[in-house]
């Protein structure tokens, strides 16, 4: 939510930002807010004047009573003032509702470094890491997507898609999951169960070492938390509701972590607060019909480890760089080639002022795919959830800044591992960083395991 003072004092800043975001239909909202706010402030001034007059009348009434003089005219005026105040306060309540309607639906103000664009095609790659395995048929596409800035090894054989690897390894049962739950669900099986849990523990250990407090949050939250953490559109497109209850299944641990300190004034000396949440995530994926319908890349349920930071406003941009760096460390340890992209205004969403994505090279698909999002939400969530801090007891509280980043979403990390670490024979060679967590160094195709057992 935006600060009404920003709109009141610098409406052109907000309008320019809406134009950059392509939200031109909301430009008239700013003029409407200014008009409503002007009327609200005029009414408030009248209310304060009337209260002052009423207090003066109370003094006069006291004096007249003491002197035994009539007070009927003063009482009549006092009662008129009470009614006038009630009417003005009622009018201001309605004005406030209208103002809040707009404020709650306006996007965050973007950082000056966010590129202007219309869609994900306008996102800007800013750095690359790793040596990609590239099938010769994907080479030209890879060079274009990596801007010629990434090392690569050309393969004469085409790596399998992760969905084919799942079948080869007997790592998942998608058909039975569809029978039981519908599309975009899966049974994870055998070594991939261990791999999923290993990825969670690996990411968790990395962040605990960096001072993050581990948290398993509630998997369901009340509506005010979701309204505070995200946009209203998500209630239709993303979030599952528990029927008959004021509860919603979380689409990410970010949301219960954002709500953790709702309506609190934090002690400034405790900032930054660093949390690493571990949870399942539940998503409708209503707006993604036809996309990634096979496999486990885009699903209704998955595990995720999430970084969440409450910081001072003046420190939040430094923390944004830190949390994306943390995520990069994790994918470097997993030996997954990737690029970091600066998300453009048209793909940014309403909540973040700036967002980085890590896109892993998927050797089977021949393209980069999103595996991490890291956002600085500045005070947009904090205003909605009323999360403030102060350094001294009598100091006026200020809103914190909130930041979040994926550490690892296990299903997508598994996709990246299966596509990048497979051999021509279909063996998956796990990165060394995971060995102590899995207890094994490779995953064999099912037919190889059967042959080993027979021998």
Swiss-Prot record:
Catalytic activity entry: tRNA(Ser) + L-serine + ATP = L-seryl-tRNA(Ser) + AMP + diphosphate + H(+); tRNA(Sec) + L-serine + ATP = L-seryl-tRNA(Sec) + AMP + diphosphate + H(+)
This protein's GO CC annotations: cytosol
Claim: Aminoacyl-tRNA synthetase is one of the keywords in the record: yes
UniProt keyword annotation of DNA-binding present: no
Pfam families reported for this sequence: Seryl_tRNA_N, tRNA-synt_2b
Keywords: Aminoacyl-tRNA synthetase, ATP-binding, Cytoplasm, Ligase, Nucleotide-binding, Protein biosynthesis
Ligand binding (ATP): 283-285, 299, 370-373
InterPro entries found in the cross-reference section: aa-tRNA-synt_IIb (IPR002314), aa-tRNA-synth_II (IPR006195), aa-tRNA-synth_II/BPL/LPL (IPR045864), Ser-tRNA-ligase_type_1 (IPR002317), Ser-tRNA-synth_1_N (IPR015866), SerRS_1_N_sf (IPR042103), SerRS_core (IPR033729), tRNA-bd_arm (IPR010978)
Coiled coil: none
Entry GO MF terms: ATP binding; serine-tRNA ligase activity; tRNA binding
Broad class of where this protein is predominantly found: cytoplasm
Enzyme class: ligase
Top-level taxon in the UniProt lineage: Archaea
Binding residue positions for L-serine: 252-254, 306, 406
EC number: 6.1.1.11
Subunit structure: Homodimer. The tRNA molecule binds across the dimer.
Written domain comment of the UniProt record: Consists of two distinct domains, a catalytic core and a N-terminal extension that is involved in tRNA binding.
HAMAP family xref list: Ser_tRNA_synth_type1
Stated family: Belongs to the class-II aminoacyl-tRNA synthetase family. Type-1 seryl-tRNA synthetase subfamily.
Stated role: Catalyzes the attachment of serine to tRNA(Ser). Is also able to aminoacylate tRNA(Sec) with serine, to form the misacylated tRNA L-seryl-tRNA(Sec), which will be further converted into selenocysteinyl-tRNA(Sec).
Protein name: Serine--tRNA ligase
Taxonomic path: Archaea, Methanobacteriati, Methanobacteriota, Thermococci, Thermococcales
């Amino acid at each position: 939510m935006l600060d009404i003072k920003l709109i009141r004092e610098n409406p052109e800043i907000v309008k320019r930002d809406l134009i950059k975001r392509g939200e031109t239909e909301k430009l008239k909202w700013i003029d409407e807010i200014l008009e409503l706010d002007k009327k609200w402030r005029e009414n408030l001034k009248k209310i304060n004047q009337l209260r002052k007059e009423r207090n003066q009348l109370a003094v006069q009434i006291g004096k007249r009573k003491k002197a035994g003089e009539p007070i009927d005219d003063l009482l009549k005026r006092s009662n008129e003032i009470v009614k006038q105040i009630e009417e003005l306060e009622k009018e201001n309540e309605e004005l406030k509702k209208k103002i809040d309607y707009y404020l709650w639906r306006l996007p965050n103000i973007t950082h000056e470094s966010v590129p202007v664009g219309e869609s994900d095609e306008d996102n800007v790659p800013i750095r690359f890491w790793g040596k990609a395995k590239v099938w010769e048929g994907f080479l030209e596409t890879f060079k274009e997507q990596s801007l010629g800035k990434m090392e690569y090894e050309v393969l004469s054989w085409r790596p399998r898609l992760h969905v084919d690897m799942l079948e080869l390894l007997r790592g998942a049962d998608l058909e039975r999951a569809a029978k039981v739950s519908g599309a975009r669900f899966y049974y994870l099986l055998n070594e991939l169960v261990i791999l999923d849990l290993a990825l969670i523990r690996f990411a968790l250990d990395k962040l605990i070492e960096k001072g993050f407090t581990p948290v398993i949050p509630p998997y369901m939250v009340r509506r005010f938390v979701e309204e505070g953490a995200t946009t209203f559109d998500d209630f239709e497109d993303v979030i599952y509701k528990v029927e008959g209850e004021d509860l919603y299944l979380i689409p990410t641990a970010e949301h219960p972590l954002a709500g953790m300190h709702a309506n609190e004034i934090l002690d400034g000396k405790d900032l930054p607060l660093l949390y690493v949440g571990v949870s399942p995530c539940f998503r409708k994926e209503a707006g993604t019909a036809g996309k990634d319908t096979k496999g486990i890349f885009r699903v209704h349920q998955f595990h995720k480890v999430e970084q969440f930071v409450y910081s001072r406003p003046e420190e939040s941009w430094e923390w944004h760089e830190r949390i994306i760096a943390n995520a990069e460390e994790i994918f470097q340890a997993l030996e997954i080639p990737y690029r970091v992209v600066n998300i453009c205004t048209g793909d940014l969403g309403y909540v973040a002022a700036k967002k980085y994505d890590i896109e892993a090279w998927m050797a089977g698909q021949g393209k980069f795919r999103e595996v991490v999002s890291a956002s600085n939400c500045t005070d947009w969530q904090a205003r909605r959830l009323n999360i403030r801090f102060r350094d001294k007891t009598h100091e006026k509280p200020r809103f914190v800044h909130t930041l979040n980043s994926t550490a690892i979403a296990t299903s997508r990390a598994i996709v990246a591992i299966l596509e990048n670490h497979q051999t021509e024979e279909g063996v998956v060679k796990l990165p060394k960083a995971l060995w102590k967590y899995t207890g094994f160094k490779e995953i064999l195709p099912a037919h190889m395991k059967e042959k080993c057992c027979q021998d």
